[in-house]
Amino acid sequence: MKKMTRNFIYLVLFAFLIWCFVYLGKKDFSSTITDAERFSKEYTTIDTDNPFVYVNSNRVLNILNNETGIILVGFSSNAWMQEYVRELYPVLKENNITKVYYYDVIEDRTKKTKNFRQIEDLLSKYLKITDMGAEYLFTPALIFVKDGKIINYDDETSLVSFDMRPDTYWNEVAITSFHNKINTYLSEADYN
């Protein structure tokens, strides 16, 4: 009788452990953060109430071919990108821009994915030529699209002298010029 009770308890405990593994294996422990919060973590000078929405290469292709919007192409580990975003954000805020599509290009560019090559083809007249003679999507790049047509393209700091640093490049004159240029681009279409 004692042995039977012990076996029953073992069986119940075993069933409970199996149930725990199944339950905990399906449970999503990740906390949900918004794109704006994620962007703010990657670009620490930007607050969490920002218009940046993460998109993949499929979405970028769809915007470039059919839609209206602003696409920011880059990656957060780039110091030039960090400064570019820091200077871009106030202009977006002033103009009440509610959505900027952010395409983190690093993985697709490294792997030269099919979609990335299609994006390069669509942007070919805006791309710079490398020393090897190939077109290359340098970042940061800001693309203004209206009804599937690129109307403006800005990659002001994508090719800067190797001895120049972002904090020395962005002086008062450069900031004013950049803000004026982006304000002009934003006035040419309704991006909201």
Question: What spans do the regions from the language model cover?
Answer:
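Thiol-based oxidoreductase modules, predominantly thioredoxin-like and allied folds used
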Residues: 45-54, 73, 97-124
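Short, internal strand/loop/helix patches
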Residues: 117-135, 145
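N-terminal, intrinsically disordered, polar/charged segments of Gram-positive cell-envelope systems
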Residues: 27-72, 94
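Non-catalytic, surface beta->alpha helical segment in thiol-disulfide oxidoreductase systems
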Residues: 135-192
